[in-house]
Amino acid sequence: MQPVLQLMSRVGPSDANVLITGEHGTGKEVVAQTLHALSNRASRPMVTVNVGGLAEGVFESEMFGHVKGAFTDAKTDRVGRFDLADGGTLFLDEIANVPLNQQAKLLRVLETGELERVGSSKTHRADVRILSATNANLNEEVAAGRFRGDLLFRLNTIEIHLPALRDRREDIPALAAHFLSVHARRYRKHLTGFDSAALQLLLQHPWPGNVRELDHAVERGALMAQKNAVGAADLGLAASRDGSIQSGRLEDMSMEEVESFLIRKALTRHGNNVSQAANALGLSRSALYRRMQRYGI
């Protein structure tokens, strides 16, 4: 992670737009928060928008705002996310999910800094730095006609790629120790670390949910531990190294653990493509996002 940290330290103080890439749970929002904190805009707001979680048809109103009477449900004026972030940073998570028919409008705002609220012809300016994140390959999205190449160029002044946790296992002990310290303090427990079996399990687990899943597992371990050291059973990691449910464990799992496992399997099977995983699970994208947040995936 040292090259990533060095790049963040160089890019953070600038006003450059940054595209943060990596699988779900690799810490993209943490990187965005750090870049904002390093910038000259740190005293101003950082506004986060989960583009993938926006209901269909509301992107323009959410981002640019609207005036009363602009459409049937517009009972009052609404301030958009660009205006809320004025002078600060706007973080667009899951940027690949911006509707294609709205991408030209977003591009224009990024190029000019000018926007109009829905239902208004009055143009005004918003001074924002754009940080965006995605787990998708945007070059492939451009080639497939689902994402505008000119918008990608505007967003991607600098790209910061976060490797999957399974590709940097040497970071697991330090990350786990950090999360344990945080959760031990939160739950007012005296915990000295992990026993050897727990540490071995942490090092061998496939971590399809990456750092977020590790944090979730360590939090559970902190809650469940009855000794000073967290044990393997406390972590609630029901999957083996190859990601399959261990023999004899299914009947011991709660409904929440089974659902969490199935979501992780679907994401792994579909290359962390949320739309495809949601379709395979019979869920809407927004429903899957809610479950992923619930289970720390």
Model-derived features: positions:
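AAA+/SF3 P-loop NTPase mechanochemical coupling elements
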Residues: 47, 74-87, 91, 99-105, ...
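N-terminal pre-P-loop "Q-motif" helix
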Residues: 1-7, 255
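Base-recognition residues in the alpha-helical recognition helix of bacterial helix-turn-helix
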Residues: 104, 108, 116, 153, ...
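Nucleotide-binding/hydrolysis machinery
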Residues: 2, 13, 39-44, 119-129, ...
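Conserved RecA-like P-loop NTPase ATPase core
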Residues: 4, 26, 49, 63, ...
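The short alpha-helix immediately C-terminal to the Walker A/P-loop
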Residues: 29-34, 61, 94, 105, ...
